[in-house]
């Protein structure tokens, strides 16, 4: 089902200073969360920095703007019914708390990783506050199907177009219209693949449609994905790999970011290069010169043995640092010098 693009009168994106009465906060120091490092690092593809240090996006079928100070995480929620304008409720704050998994002490994890890994210790000094999001399994699955042979900017565009075409319209802020993520029935509908190809998803369009149909027709629906949260890591990974378009790396992304498997270590070319360059790692069970299912498992075990049960979280810190460094290297020297302080925690 395609959703209409007709727009009604819009609200504006809020900032903490423009409408302080509509914000609420959670105690959260920057050492536990850095929004700029977490929301733009390829975990979720639905957040934009609409004004300086204010990130707007969709979470749990609501539109939010987030910002932070040195010790508080602030949020505001835009509700479609203008009669419901007000500060975020306790339930909404709990949704945000769970999304960022704030029950997990990042400071303690960093301390442990630094104690067993001198390279991590040197990197972490400048990249405090990188933690894993706990995402909706359906959104995470189809977002990472779009990630195949892709980069963050292009994935973000694909996911946004998919939501605009097949997701429910939520609210318009300034000139930006926000949509919820499509459900499985919307993605399994007739002509979906053709439409997604027109939207630029290429061969991934077939995988999106086929995986949605497989979950609905062979696995019994979205509850199957939710149930993988209580399955073992190995069981969940194996189950995900039965879906069209899901290989070992995509399955590890979903396990780590949506299915409560903090030991999952997604291996792409970035992580492969980090392992070779910074750890001198070489595969023993495979002669491959790049990521492969067998080598990925071996490398994942290497990092799990090094970092422990939250190995996937530690990998995310190094991935974010490597990504930020690559982005800086592409900037013109003048801009790099001007913005260099922003890369340090």
Curated annotation (Swiss-Prot):
Q: Where in the cell is it found?
A: Nucleus, Nucleoplasm; Nucleus speckle; Nucleus matrix
Which of this chain's residues are annotated to bind 8-oxoguanine? 266, 268, 315, 319
Q: Gene Ontology cellular component? A: mitochondrion; nuclear matrix; nuclear speck; nucleoplasm; nucleus; protein-containing complex
* Gene Ontology biological process terms from the UniProt entry: base-excision repair; base-excision repair, AP site formation; cellular response to cadmium ion; cellular response to reactive oxygen species; DNA damage response; DNA repair; negative regulation of apoptotic process; negative regulation of double-strand break repair via single-strand annealing
Instruction: Please name the Pfam families in this protein's record.
Output: HhH-GPD, OGG_N
PANTHER family in the record: 8-OXOGUANINE DNA GLYCOSYLASE (PTHR10242), N-GLYCOSYLASE_DNA LYASE (PTHR10242:SF2)
This protein is called N-glycosylase/DNA lyase
């Amino acid at each position: 089902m395609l959703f209409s693009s007709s727009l009604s009168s819009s609200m504006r994106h809020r900032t903490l200073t423009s409408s302080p009465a509509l914000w609420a906060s959670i105690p959260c120091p920057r050492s536990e969360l850095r929004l700029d490092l977490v929301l733009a690092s390829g975990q979720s593809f639905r957040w934009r920095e609409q004004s300086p240090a204010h990130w707007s996006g969709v979470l749990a079928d609501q539109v939010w703007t987030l910002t932070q100070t040195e010790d508080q995480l602030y949020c505001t929620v835009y509700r479609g019914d203008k009669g419901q304008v007000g500060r975020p409720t306790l339930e909404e704050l709990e949704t945000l708390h769970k999304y960022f998994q704030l029950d997990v002490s990042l400071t303690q994890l960093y301390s442990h990783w630094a104690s067993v890994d001198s390279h991590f210790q040197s990197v972490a000094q400048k990249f405090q506050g990188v933690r894993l999001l706990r995402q909706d399994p359906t959104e995470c699955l189809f977002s990472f199907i779009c990630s195949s042979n892709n980069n963050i900017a292009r994935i973000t565009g694909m996911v946004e177009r998919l939501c605009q075409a097949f997701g429910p319209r939520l609210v318009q802020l300034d000139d930006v219209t926000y949509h919820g993520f499509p459900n499985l029935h919307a993605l399994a509908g007739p002509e979906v693949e053709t439409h997604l190809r027109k939207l630029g998803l290429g061969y991934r369009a077939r995988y999106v449609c086929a995986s949605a149909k497989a979950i609905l027709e062979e696995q019994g629906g979205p509850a199957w994905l939710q149930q993988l949260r209580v399955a073992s890591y190995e069981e969940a990974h194996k189950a995900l790999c039965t879906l069209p378009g899901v290989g070992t790396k995509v399955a590890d992304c979903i396990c780590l970011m949506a299915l409560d498997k903090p030991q999952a270590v997604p291996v792409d070319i970035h992580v492969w290069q980090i392992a070779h360059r910074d750890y001198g790692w070489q595969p023993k069970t495979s002669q491959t010169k790049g990521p492969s299912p067998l080598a990925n498992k071996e490398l994942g075990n290497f990092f799990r043995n090094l970092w422990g049960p939250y190995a996937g979280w530690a990998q995310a810190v190094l991935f974010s640092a490597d990504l930020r460094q690559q982005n800086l290297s592409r900037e013109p020297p003048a801009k790099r010098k001007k913005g260099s302080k922003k890369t340090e925690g």
